[in-house]
Amino acid sequence: MEQDLIVSLGQRALEMTLLLALPVLLSTFVVGLVVSIFQAATQIQEMTLSYIPKVITAFLVIFLLGGWMMRKLVDFAVEIFANIPVWIR
């Protein structure tokens, strides 16, 4: 395998990882920010108040977008495995 091919595969794998992780990370970030602003405004310093909404949000996003995420991941894996014979030559 050539160096360019390996770098390209690594780059595409990182892009896929970012694409699949971004919805969960972004939604939990927004919920955490909103809860933190609420806690600062009301002076409530309960740790579980910030943790539980983020976990619920992450599960909800995975539940709603899980099919799309799996489809993207399977398509990527199928493409990788289908091209292995071409890359070996």
UniProtKB/Swiss-Prot annotation:
Subcellular location: Cell membrane; Bacterial flagellum basal body
Top-rank taxon: Bacteria
Principal location listed in the UniProt entry: membrane
Transmembrane segments: 18-38, 49-69
Membrane topology term: Multi-pass membrane protein
Keywords: Bacterial flagellum, Cell membrane, Membrane, Transmembrane, Transmembrane helix
Gene Ontology CC: bacterial-type flagellum basal body; plasma membrane
InterPro entries the record matches: Bac_export_3 (IPR002191), FliQ (IPR006305)
Any one of the GO BP annotations: protein secretion
PANTHER family found in the cross-reference section: FLAGELLAR BIOSYNTHETIC PROTEIN FLIQ
Family: Belongs to the FliQ/MopD/SpaQ family.
Summary of the function given for this chain in its UniProt record: Role in flagellar biosynthesis.
Protein's recorded name: Flagellar biosynthetic protein FliQ
